[in-house]
Amino acid sequence: MDQNPFEASYEYAIQSDKQDELAAFQNEFYKKADTIYLDGNSLGLLSKRAEKSLLTMLNSWKEHGIDGWTEGEYPWFFLSEQLSEHIAPLIGALSEEIIVTGSTTTNIHQVIATFYEPKGIRTKILADELTFPSDIYALQSQIRLKGLDPNEHLVRVKSRDGRTLDEEDIIAAMTDDIALILLPAVLYRSGQILDMKRLTAEAHKRGIHIGFDLCHSIGAIPHQFQEWGVDFAVWCNYKYLNAGPGSVGGLYVNKKHFARLPGLSGWFSSRKDKQFDMEHTLTAAEHAGAYQIGTPHIFSIAPLIGSLEIFKEAGIDRLRQKSLHITRYMLHLIDYELTDKGFTIGNPLEDEKRGGHIYLEHPEAARICKALKANGVIPDFRAPNGIRLAPVALYNTYEEVWKSVRILKKIMTNEEYKQFENKRGVVA
């Protein structure tokens, strides 16, 4: 597939789809006719395999009852650990360093409760002012639980432009009073990729544990955690990994920390052969499974089984290659068709700094998103003035990208957006 130059013609889009080596995966997903879904960075589409694995799990309950914990196609008792083997290639880690459990926010509470140990002058947590609000709420809660004031002990790196973070500023903020760092791998608005390898090395030079929120990176970009030495990470599985709304999240802990007792424990923290001894002294699992707390939500895990099969076949490197190409193509069309429509491109243009979605800014963003939906294009609004468009490598086409930009041009030229209020819905 040619890297450059792109062409603005419809024929170019069709030809690009013919050359797409991942095109067959589009048939794996339920896509509505007359709808262009560009919101996979918020909630991925349902695949037929994810549907099948959920139905298989329901049938296991029907057929086996309580014995479903150890019988059936996917015995529930070992499911979280077994899925770790399929996630490992996506983040470049060992399977024993990964567990499917909790949600992003509860997993943040888990890793912070484990790794945040304020002592002496090292009492502060370093985050950033652009991160997702739930991360901040969790950090503030954990600081309060230590009897400290979040206003004093939570440091947020400021953005120079309101969209991105400068890694030099992050490193400069790694001062002697920082005990722990939590940063997004990819910023949820602008899609900027942070240099996790460099930031981890700089944190470790200063004796600081560092972890990342992978919600907007896992399934979209490759990671090499074994090489980089990241201490911990958390993520959701319902965006690029297409495991469904409310699906169980994921947690990574570097194996060098396995001797550390989890900050939050429960009976599923136990070593499997000891769990049903019902002792009041925890014998923790000797891997990331120790970071589980309660009984796993089996039906919220089940769709991930089918979804991860697709990722194994497609390969994260091929997915990233297409993602980069199709987002470059969309940026080219936006520049060609929408230069006089008041849009500002808010995402990095460099491939190595751009995640899986495009971020446009416009004063009328909220009602432009409503107009797009009225025209069959599903975007994502993010306050105060952002439009996120995610052409997902597994199921979006170049033709869809071409059509969506043309529709956006029509909306702006005809001022169709003025039919709507310029404020977000209950769920943006």
Curated annotation (Swiss-Prot):
InterPro entries: Kynureninase, PyrdxlP-dep_Trfase, PyrdxlP-dep_Trfase_major, PyrdxlP-dep_Trfase_small. GO terms for biological process: anthranilate metabolic process; L-kynurenine catabolic process; L-tryptophan catabolic process to kynurenine; NAD biosynthetic process; quinolinate biosynthetic process. GO terms for molecular function: kynureninase activity; pyridoxal phosphate binding. It catalyses: L-kynurenine + H2O = anthranilate + L-alanine + H(+); 3-hydroxy-L-kynurenine + H2O = 3-hydroxyanthranilate + L-alanine + H(+). The keyword Manganese does not apply. The keyword Hydrolase applies. Pfam families: KYNU_C (PF22580). Pathway: Amino-acid degradation; L-kynurenine degradation; L-alanine and anthranilate from L-kynurenine: step 1/1; Cofactor biosynthesis; NAD(+) biosynthesis; quinolinate from L-kynurenine: step 2/3. Keywords: Hydrolase, Pyridine nucleotide biosynthesis, Pyridoxal phosphate. The modification N6-(pyridoxal phosphate)lysine is found at K239. Its EC number is 3.7.1.3. GO terms for cellular component: cytoplasm. Pyridoxal 5'-phosphate binds at T104, T105, F132, P133, S134, D135, D213, H216, Y238, W267, T295. Gene3D superfamilies: Aspartate Aminotransferase, domain 1 (3.90.1150.10), Type I PLP-dependent aspartate aminotransferase-like (Major domain) (3.40.640.10). Its cofactor is pyridoxal 5'-phosphate. It is an enzyme of class 3 (hydrolase). Belongs to the kynureninase family. Homodimer. Catalyzes the cleavage of L-kynurenine (L-Kyn) and L-3-hydroxykynurenine (L-3OHKyn) into anthranilic acid (AA) and 3-hydroxyanthranilic acid (3-OHAA), respectively. This is Kynureninase.
